[in-house]
């Protein structure tokens, strides 16, 4: 099994989209790469902790490659906008790809380079090692499953 952590604005929609992909075996939402230990949702929303809202993804490489998974990710974000996705504004809504294994970096960079060809503006999506991940509160986990009419800025069709 492999793991990747993706930031694509509000984490509810990113998780709902990713968990529908064949080969994804686990998802959970949380906060990554900030400077405060175990922050609360309210703290992250203050834009003072440095965290991004993220979706942790564990996937089976025999069913889906990191490259294909990233292709899905690029479809649901605007990678040229900084600190915003849809109507959600703030540094916690930035886009990012946070990896735990150095060998994934080449695939991630190649994926970004392929996507850049589709845009006139530069892609501003962060690509960084995962420094810290904290689970979000339970009420955020599988939020759109628990609240089918809940807010989501992305198209959940795969």
UniProtKB/Swiss-Prot annotation:
GO biological process, one term: protein modification process
EC number: 1.8.4.11
GO molecular function, one term: peptide-methionine (S)-S-oxide reductase activity
SUPFAM superfamilies xrefs: Peptide methionine sulfoxide reductase
Any one GO cellular component localisation term in the record: cytoplasm
Annotated coiled-coil segments of the chain: none
InterPro entries given in the database record: Met_Sox_Rdtase_MsrA_dom (IPR002569), Met_Sox_Rdtase_MsrA_sf (IPR036509), MsrA_MetSO_reductase (IPR050162)
EC top class, as a word: oxidoreductase
Catalytic activity: L-methionyl-[protein] + [thioredoxin]-disulfide + H2O = L-methionyl-(S)-S-oxide-[protein] + [thioredoxin]-dithiol; [thioredoxin]-disulfide + L-methionine + H2O = L-methionine (S)-S-oxide + [thioredoxin]-dithiol
Keyword terms, alphabetized: Oxidoreductase
Gene3D superfamilies for this protein: Peptide methionine sulphoxide reductase MsrA (3.30.1060.10)
Active-site feature positions: 10
UniProt family annotation: Belongs to the MsrA Met sulfoxide reductase family.
Entry function: Has an important function as a repair enzyme for proteins that have been inactivated by oxidation. Catalyzes the reversible oxidation-reduction of methionine sulfoxide in proteins to methionine.
Protein name: Peptide methionine sulfoxide reductase MsrA
Source organism per UniProt: Alkaliphilus metalliredigens (strain QYMF)
Gene: msrA
């Amino acid at each position: 099994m492999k793991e990747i952590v993706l930031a694509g604005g509000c984490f509810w929609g990113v998780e709902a989209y990713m968990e529908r992909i064949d080969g994804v075996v686990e998802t959970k939402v949380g906060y990554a790469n900030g400077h405060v230990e175990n922050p609360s949702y309210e703290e992250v929303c203050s834009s003072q902790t440095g965290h991004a809202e993220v979706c942790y993804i564990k996937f089976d490489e025999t069913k889906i490659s990191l490259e294909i998974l990233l292709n899905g990710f690029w479809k649901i974000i605007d990678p040229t906008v900084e600190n915003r996705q849809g109507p959600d504004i703030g540094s916690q809504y930035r886009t990012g790809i946070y990896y735990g294994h150095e060998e994934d970096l080449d695939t991630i960079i190649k994926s970004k380079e392929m996507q850049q060809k589709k845009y006139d503006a530069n892609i501003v999506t962060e690509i960084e090692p995962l420094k810290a991940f904290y689970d979000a509160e339970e009420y955020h986990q599988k939020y759109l499953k628990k609240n089918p009419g809940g807010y989501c800025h992305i198209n959940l069709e795969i």
